[in-house]
Amino acid sequence: MSVDQTGMQGTRWTGIVPILISAAILVACGAPPADAPAERASQSQESMASAIPVQGPVVVFLGDSLTAGFGLPAEDALPEQVASILKSEGIEARVINAGVSGDTTANGLSRFDWSVTAADADLVVVALGANDYLMGIDPERVKQNLSAIVQKARENNIECVLVDLQPRSAVEEGSRDAAFAAIYPELATQFGLKYYPSLMTGVANQPDLLQTDGLHPTEKGVRVMAENLAQFLEPIIEAYE
């Protein structure tokens, strides 16, 4: 397969919901409810145990609920579906789901060593930042955290793919929303990263691909996300062969 990254990046700031910044994407990754600590710990333990036992480079997905597979069986989560698609294309990779619902960029940074480095990762796919927005964390702090994650990856010779949580509607120039929207492409340019511009392309605003909360993708919705992301990752992973 091949992917037109330029074309993907060109599809920016469109959508049908006049909200600040991707509520259907960002809330989907939002902070867990009050009774969630035990669930979150369970998800974390399950995530770290979900390595696909195959050959090839170790690919760790570091993210929040969209990575963890909120509301879905473990085998239907995004990393697992990506692994299945890659395998069907004859591409071997040992995929690890290190997604934790409710995680912020600070959480991802604090657990990088045991979630990513300890897994002997060759490649880390970073999809974090949504919960920072919901919690009102300053965009500059988010950028610093993501930058530190990228630097940790580099210090450990781990290649990094940065996944953007792109707004679906226009944002006002100079606003906090615009500052958040600029974080990912700016970091990708600064560090020369592989940059995936929109995680929920083809799924956001599609009720038949979302769970009853209207936020989290169904198994079919995740499949759409996985097909797009797998297409993007294929040449990156093939380069390890």
Where are these regions (language model features)?
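Bacterial signal peptide processing site
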Residues: 30-33
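Residue-level signal for mature regions of secreted extracellular proteins and peptides
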Residues: 22-23
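C-terminal motif of bacterial Sec signal peptides marking the signal peptidase cleavage site
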Residues: 26-28
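Gly/Ser/Thr-rich beta-alpha loop segments that engage phosphate groups in nucleotides
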Residues: 65, 71-73, 101-104, 131, ...
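Serine-esterase "nucleophile elbow" of acetyl-processing enzymes
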Residues: 37-101, 111-120
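Bacterial N-terminal signal peptides that target proteins for export
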Residues: 2-19
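Alpha-helical cap/lid subdomain in secreted, periplasmic
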Residues: 107-241
